[in-house]
Structure formats: structure tokens, C-alpha cells
């Protein structure tokens, strides 16, 4: 009799949970339509892979790319709609979140054609690779729209787990295994630190998990200036710092960049920073509204360390991927300036604009590295000497992307940095902007050093890798060139395109 009653209660509880989930999906599902497209694409990939043979491989690329493009289209159609909170307060839809989701989708869309030839040459498992890319993209999109502490913790874990698997995708490579181990251990530690900070925030607010409700809870409990909030701020900053990889939370970055497959590095180098930046702006600006002076100071220290250490250590590197790893540490220091400035002086708009240009500059550079690596099998900067004599198109593309990363006019990187530094100067961050300007000049040195090698024509400096280089024709079926051309064009956009981009970015208030 007791078992019968317990069984009936279990069935009733299960039915209530199912009906509640169905109700949420029915009424709130339209607000996550772009994410649903990616989920449908994931299911379709699994179905095709389990029922087809090797001849259907092009369909896997087509489905992945189409899912991403359709998701971008759905986001664009939803632009300028009223902000909405759905799924019982777990998810928020507004222009600010959507523009970061657009950037993540753009990164993934460009990374897939960049990876095709690499996967074919290295004989990597295609379906799993595409599944991890789409799942990581999905996690990043949910992180951008996360509105409570649980979702903010679960969404990046979804992204991180896929990142660990992708970084160790070449299991026979010792460097890849080492990079994955370090990445996994440090990622697990940072997640523990982050959730510990969330627990302090949860307790101080009286048990609230939604971001805006946490602010109300802190006011009601009079805990907004308590030591507990300071402890929460420190732990959360350290946890988010792992995702952004500013100094001194950058130890995993060079090893992961060097040991992971190059298309994976290209994907992680931009998507992780975009998603973490979106999350950081909301966490610091909403729950820590009353501690703005404290988190401004913390981020200023991180920005200064990142800009100085990243650019100084990049000068000494001999590996192209390690050089870009330290360069990315310096670049995130510039992005942090926009986060500190905030919405009052156009900081978020300048950060979003620079992030858009950074995506094109960085992915364009990695597209060139993938192409060169497949034809020579080397990643050493010295082995790029004389590339212009063998493949002028590739050499010029790499040179333009590097010059744009350095911020030389009239390339896109110059105008992105100019607007970012100008907003910081207007906000009174004179010392921070001065450090940014000096380190930008410093970064030009090691970028120009590589460009000088590319353009050299002296036979004694050209290594056997370039002498035996198999040139890829300009008009070929090579999908890497598609991503490369798009990124190079976007990296060289003149300043005339800045105004409409900034106007769109300024329309992202939350």
C-alpha cells in the first residue's frame, strides 16, 4: 500500500515537472529560436553520421554552416525587439546580448571553412569536431543571455567541456595531450573559484540568483558594502579571468595555443573572449553596481599587467602560435578598457566594435597560419622567411592582418583602438590609455619583424620549408581561402565604415 502511494506521488510529480517544462518551451521557446536552430542542426548531424557513409561528408559541413547562418538570420530578424526575460528569469533577450551572440556565431561560421582542409589532411574525426564546435557555440550563446547565477555557471561549463575535447583532438600529439591536461586542470580550478564567489553573492543577497534580484536583495539586507561582497568580487574576477585569459590568469594560454590543432586555436581565441566579455559586463555592472570602484581597480590592474606582459613576452617567441597567444593576452587588456569605461562614455560600443575587428584580424591571421602549416608542416616564425617569393597572396594577407592587429592606419585595427582609447581618455583613464598606446607601439615591432621575414628575397635567409613550398592557386576550391579573404577584407576596412558600426553598437543598452 505504501509503495503504491509513493508510486502515484512519483508519477504526479513527474507529470507536473514535464508539464511545466512543456509550458516554458511552448511560451518561451520562440525567444531562444536561434539556439533551437543549432540544437536541430546538432541532432541532424548525429542522424546523418549514424545512417550514412564517407560520401556524405560534404553534407556535414553544409548542415553545420547552414545552421549557423540560419541562426544569424534569426538573430538579425529579432533585432530591436523589446527586451524580454524568459524561462522563469533564467534567460534575457535584448540587443546587448544579441550582438555578442552574433559575434560568436560569426566566429563559428568563419572557423568551419577554415577547418575543412586541415581535417582532411590530418584525418581527424569530422562529425565529432563539428558537434563540439556547434555545442560550444550553443554554450557561448546561452552564456550571453544568462540572467541568473546557475545559467552563468552551467553555460560556460558547456563551452569549456567542448574546448577541452577540441584542444586534445589530436590524441597522438604529446603537446596536445599536455595542453589539454593543463587546460582541464586550470579550467576545473577556475570553475570552483567562480562558483565559490557565486555562493558568497547568493548568501549576501538573501538567497537570490537572478542578477537584478541580487541587487534588490543586497539593498534589503544592507549587505552591498559588506566584506562578503568584496570576497565574492575577488573570487568571481579570478574565475572570469580564466575565460578572458588576462595576466596573471594566462598560464594556460601559450601551451594550449601551441599544442592544440590550429583551427581549434582559431576558434577558442575569439569565441571564449567574446562570451566571457559579454558575461563580465553584466556581472560587474549589475550585481556589483555598488562596488564599482573596487572592480574598476581590479580590472585596471589586470589590463595593465596584460598589456605589458603580453606584448613584452610576445617579442621573444619563436613559434607563431605562441606569439599570437601572448599577443591575445595584450589584446584582451585593450578590451578590458572598454569594460571599465562602461556605458556612460561609449565604452561598451567601443569594446564591441574592437571585438568585431579583432575577430577578423585574428581569424585572418590563423587562416594564413593553417594554410602555411599544411604546406610546410612548421610553425616556426623563422621558417616564414621569403614566403612572398613563393605565395604573394598568402604573404600579403598575413601581412595585412598582422598590421591591423598592430593598429597601423588606415586598417581596421587602428580605428578600433583609436575609438577604444578615446573613450577611455574621456572617462579619465589617462594612465591606462597611455599604457595601451605604448604597448600598441611595442606590438608593432614584433609584427613588423615577421612581415620583414615574409618579404625577404635573400636566398641565404630562405629555409627549405619555403623553398619546397607548394603554392596554392588563387582560384581554387580551398575553403581556407574563403575565410581568409573575408577576414582580410574586414581587417582592412577604412575608417569610413566606423560610424555605422559604432551606431549599431551604441544601440545595445541593457
UniProtKB/Swiss-Prot annotation:
Q: Recite the UniProt keywords alphabetically.
A: Chloroplast, Membrane, NAD, NADP, Plastid, Plastoquinone, Quinone, Thylakoid, Translocase, Transmembrane, Transmembrane helix, Transport
| GO molecular function term, any single one | NADH dehydrogenase (ubiquinone) activity
The transmembrane residues are: 24-44, 57-77, 99-119, 124-144, 149-169, 183-203, 227-247, 295-315, 323-343, 354-374, 395-415, 418-438, 484-504
How does this protein lie in the membrane? Answer: Multi-pass membrane protein
Q: Where in the cell is it found?
A: Plastid, Chloroplast thylakoid membrane
Q: Which cysteines are joined by disulfide bonds?
A: none
Specify the domain of life of the species encoding this protein: Eukaryota
Give the principal location in a single coarse category.
plastid
Q: Which GO terms describe its cellular component?
A: chloroplast thylakoid membrane
- Catalytic activity, as annotated: a plastoquinone + NADH + (n+1) H(+)(in) = a plastoquinol + NAD(+) + n H(+)(out); a plastoquinone + NADPH + (n+1) H(+)(in) = a plastoquinol + NADP(+) + n H(+)(out)
InterPro entries (UniProt xref)? NADH-Q_OxRdtase_suN/2, ND/Mrp_TM, Ndh2_N
Catalytic class of the enzyme: translocase
Quaternary structure (record): NDH is composed of at least 16 different subunits, 5 of which are encoded in the nucleus.
Function text: NDH shuttles electrons from NAD(P)H:plastoquinone, via FMN and iron-sulfur (Fe-S) centers, to quinones in the photosynthetic chain and possibly in a chloroplast respiratory chain. The immediate electron acceptor for the enzyme in this species is believed to be plastoquinone. Couples the redox reaction to proton translocation, and thus conserves the redox energy in a proton gradient.
The entry's protein name is NAD(P)H-quinone oxidoreductase subunit 2 A, chloroplastic
Mind giving the lineage of the organism this protein is from? Eukaryota, Viridiplantae, Streptophyta, Embryophyta, Tracheophyta
Amino acid at each position: 500500500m505504501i509503495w503504491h502511494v509513493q508510486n502515484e506521488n512519483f508519477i504526479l510529480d513527474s507529470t507536473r515537472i514535464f508539464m511545466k517544462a512543456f509550458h516554458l518551451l511552448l511560451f518561451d521557446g520562440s525567444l531562444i529560436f536561434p539556439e533551437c536552430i543549432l540544437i536541430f542542426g546538432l541532432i541532424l548531424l548525429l542522424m546523418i553520421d549514424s545512417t550514412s557513409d564517407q560520401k556524405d561528408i560534404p553534407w556535414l559541413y553544409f548542415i553545420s554552416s547552414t545552421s549557423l547562418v540560419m541562426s544569424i538570420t534569426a538573430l538579425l530578424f529579432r533585432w530591436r525587439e523589446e527586451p524580454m526575460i524568459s524561462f522563469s528569469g533564467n534567460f534575457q533577450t535584448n540587443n546587448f546580448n544579441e550582438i555578442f551572440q552574433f559575434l560568436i556565431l560569426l566566429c563559428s561560421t568563419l572557423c568551419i571553412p577554415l577547418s575543412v582542409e586541415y581535417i582532411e589532411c590530418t584525418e581527424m574525426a569530422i562529425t565529432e569536431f563539428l558537434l563540439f564546435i556547434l555545442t560550444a557555440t550553443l554554450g557561448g550563446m546561452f552564456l550571453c543571455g544568462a540572467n541568473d547565477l546557475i545559467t552563468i555557471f552551467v553555460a560556460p561549463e558547456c563551452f569549456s567541456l567542448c574546448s577541452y575535447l577540441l584542444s586534445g583532438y589530436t590524441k597522438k600529439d604529446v603537446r596536445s595531450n599536455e595542453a589539454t591536461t593543463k587546460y582541464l586542470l586550470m579550467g576545473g580550478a577556475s570553475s570552483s573559484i567562480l562558483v565559490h564567489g557565486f555562493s558568497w553573492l547568493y548568501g549576501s543577497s538573501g538567497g537570490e540568483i537572478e542578477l537584478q534580484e541580487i541587487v534588490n536583495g543586497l539593498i534589503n539586507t544592507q549587505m552591498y558594502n559588506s566584506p562578503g561582497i568584496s570576497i565574492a568580487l575577488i573570487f568571481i574576477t579570478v574565475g572570469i579571468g580564466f575565460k578572458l585569459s588576462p595576466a596573471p590568469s594566462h598560464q594556460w594560454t601559450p601551451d594550449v595555443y601551441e599544442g592544440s590543432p590550429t583551427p581549434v586555436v582559431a576558434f577558442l581565441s575569439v569565441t571564449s573572449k567574446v562570451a566571457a566579455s559579454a558575461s563580465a559586463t553584466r556581472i560587474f555592472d549589475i550585481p556589483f553596481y555598488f562596488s564599482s570602484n573596487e572592480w574598476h581597480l581590479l580590472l585596471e590592474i589586470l589590463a595593465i599587467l596584460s598589456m605589458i606582459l603580453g606584448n613584452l613576452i610576445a617579442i621573444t617567441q619563436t613559434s607563431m602560435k605562441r606569439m599570437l597567444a601572448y599577443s591575445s593576452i595584450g589584446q584582451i587588456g585593450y578590451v578590458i578598457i572598454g569594460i571599465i569605461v562602461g556605458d556612460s562614455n561609449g565604452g561598451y560600443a567601443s569594446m564591441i566594435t574592437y571585438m568585431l575587428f579583432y575577430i577578423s584580424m585574428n581569424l585572418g591571421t590563423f587562416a594564413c597560419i593553417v594554410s602555411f602549416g599544411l604546406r610546410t608542416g612548421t610553425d616556426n616564425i623563422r621558417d616564414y622567411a621569403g614566403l612572398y617569393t613563393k605565395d604573394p597572396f598568402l604573404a600579403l594577407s598575413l601581412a595585412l592582418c598582422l598590421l591591423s592587429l598592430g593598429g597601423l592606419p588606415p586598417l581596421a585595427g587602428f580605428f578600433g583602438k583609436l575609438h577604444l582609447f578615446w573613450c577611455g581618455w574621456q572617462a579619465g583613464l589617462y594612465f591606462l590609455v597611455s599604457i595601451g598606446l605604448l604597448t600598441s607601439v611595442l606590438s608593432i615591432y614584433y609584427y613588423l619583424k615577421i612581415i620583414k621575414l615574409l618579404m625577404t628575397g635573400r636566398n641565404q635567409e630562405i629555409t627549405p620549408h619555403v623553398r619546397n613550398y607548394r603554392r596554392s592557386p588563387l582560384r581554387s576550391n580551398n575553403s581556407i581561402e574563403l575565410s581568409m579573404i573575408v577576414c582580410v577584407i574586414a581587417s582592412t576596412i577604412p575608417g569610413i565604415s566606423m560610424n555605422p558600426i559604432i551606431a549599431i553598437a551604441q544601440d545595445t543598452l541593457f
